[in-house]
Amino acid sequence: MLYGRERFYMTGNIVIFVTDQRQSNLAACLPGKIHRLDWRRGVEKEEALEVLDNSKYLVLPVPVTKIERNHDVNFILKEELTGKKERDWILFGGVFGPEWRQRCEDAGTEYYDMMTDAVVVHRNACITAEATVAEILKYSDYSIRGQKIIVSGYGRCGKEIARVLSAMGAKVTVLARSAEARRLARTEGHEAVDFSYGPEEAYGARTVVNTVPALVIREPMIREMHSDAVIIDIASRPGGTDLMAAETYGIKVVAALGLPGLYTTKSSAKVLADAILEHSKIRQDGKEAKTWIYQIAI
């Protein structure tokens, strides 16, 4: 029988599926009593259903597809969402793909994609920028101050990364397709050019940070890089770098995915927790918590 089931059954219990340190820290940011479970080596369906039957809020990873790494959990969730039993769940997660969105909509299950929240995206970008600095210092042989650094893309993360690097004394050049993005980058004090000038700008740069989830760091640009240059690619898979060209020319590429789940993970968890509390009725009333948080390692 579940821990605390009789006492807390109708109070909106929470399930957090833990795939990284950020998810692990998330429980401490939410009101409730924490009970830890470990399903990494498999889970009995009866136990899983008992947890799910007693929960209102399911917090999936960022991105949501990380749940698919655990076959048992992924299968049970899919089965329950598409089954005949009506589920009064609210799902939280980041980057719900078309399949997950369709599954929730077909089941009439409410879901909230935290990575569509402007506040979450901005705070996440700030953390990502700091983490990117850590990655540069870890993999580059050069200090940031005085270094020419190329930032590929000028979206939320690109803007924040360029701002932080510039504040640290880097000579930042932004690559952006949009004329408006280039204009904005220049108003912030950066050099800014179209991607067609990438090869020319690559000469003399020792670090390239890519934020674009499309193939933009191509062979002509990689060919011009110095042998000790490094590419920090933070874009979602498959990234934006021609890996074969990088291997051919001996250029180091670091696939720096999910940085908020690796760095400053308590701050990163607080960002998600604030969004969950903002879009739910989870609250701690009185001196004693009335909610159980099932923190499940998968």
Where are the model-predicted features located?
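Phosphate-coordination loops involved in phosphoryl transfer and adenosine-cofactor binding
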Residues: T11-N13, D88, R145-K148, D228
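Glycine-rich adenosine-cofactor-binding loop
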Residues: I14-N25, R145-L165
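Residues in the short beta-alpha loop(s) of Rossmann-like NAD(P)-binding domains
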Residues: D20, R40, G97, R177-S178, ...
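NAD(P)-binding Rossmann-fold cofactor-contacting core
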Residues: K33-E44, A170-E188
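Glycine/serine-rich phosphate-binding loop and adjoining beta1-alpha1 elements at the start
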Residues: V59-R145, T265, A275, I282
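Rossmann-like adenosine-cofactor binding region
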Residues: P63-N70, I76-L91, E188-G261
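Rossmann-fold NAD(P)-binding glycine/threonine-rich loop
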Residues: V95-Y112, A235-H279
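Conserved S-adenosyl-L-methionine
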Residues: A167-K171, I251
